Amino acid sequence: MVYCFLKRNILTSILYTNCVNNERFKIQIYHHFSTMAAVLKHWREAATLLVVAKTSKLIPNGVNGGGLQLAGTGSEQSQYNYKMLMLKRSTKSKFMPNVYVFPGGIAEDADFSAEWLDLYKKFGESESKELLKYLTSAGAGPPMFSRTRDQEFQHIPSELAFRICAIRETFEESGVLIARSIEDKSHLNSDYPRKPVWGTSVPMETQVSDEWRKRVDKNPLEFIKMCRTLNVIPDVWSLSEWTNWLTPVTLSSTGKGARRRYDTAFFMCVVDHLPEAMHDNNETVHLKWIAPDTLLSEYSHSKGLLAPPQVYEVHRLLHFQLVEDLHRFNWDRALNHRVRQYFPVVVGCEDGIVVVYPGDELYPEEPDRIGESPILTVKCSLEDLPKRYPSMNRMVVAGHHWVNTSAGDGQVIPDFEWTFPESLQPKL
């Protein structure tokens, strides 16, 4: 493979919208920027949660007048028996404004607090030991899980801390609290973790929920206090790893959010009902429960913006019409494979550029994660690229994805060949 170099002066926003993975890492780029648990020199660590809720067959999609998404309202029918929780970011957001995303956010020192270990031990010694054993049973994960942290943040494994972060942020942004009573040990018997664990959500009075959401948003340590007060514990048992995305290096230092980068763990939690949820009117301004096919139909017809990782990941979900199949697949996959870090790399061609992901034969062995090297280029036209480099996991500038190979982490290949069912076609 012959690479030449192209100056970093094209396409100021394409990398803002895409990400890719890699298996080999240069340790020297992970120096700390401060003593905070999840802050590095070039990016911050974060967690997000795919909350997948089982519905009855062919439940229509819709939103009621108050902004609370409920089953049984609307007209469009889905081929899927589940919906995902999606939140629209505020136009004032410094990162990806006005875009629909999964709930989530930046990890805080409180997520790594030793108080959590005490709380989980209170839940049960044997359950805690099995949990900690399960979290790393598939081996070492990508850097955000496996790197060594400052001693004050080593009380609990990163795998546990980022799950707590995902649950905390989901509660702050949507009011959905994935937790279980301190007395509830159901589904955590000798079969755990061989069988998928369904998530549990804690119902709360709106006034109580709103008060705690505000308190936790102002001070993440309040999340621990809330759990103690309500006698609940974050249901980390039901969260399985889904993927890991690192925001790419932008080609311009200008623009809203251009310098903001995040190494984000994506988790999945499957629940057997649609929990009541409401956006926070701060970071998020709209909320909806929506099936994957309906979401992509809306996106393709310009009815809403999606963050690029969401576009890629939701296309994976298209393989699973039944939530039971999705749950079993990802649970078994997570038992045997750790996620890989998806970090997008731009490759220049003679007449354009593509963004390549892990598994693509154009993906470099040592990608430049901090933007010190010129953009890689290949002497080939876009038209000839699939012929010369047929193992593809890439995106063309126009937004089209060419994917026929996996990243080697046990995940399914996104179904970009999917077409809209007749019931979801736009009405002319």
Where are these regions (language model features)?
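N-terminal leader/linker segments that precede catalytic domains of diphosphate-processing enzymes
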Residues: 2-428
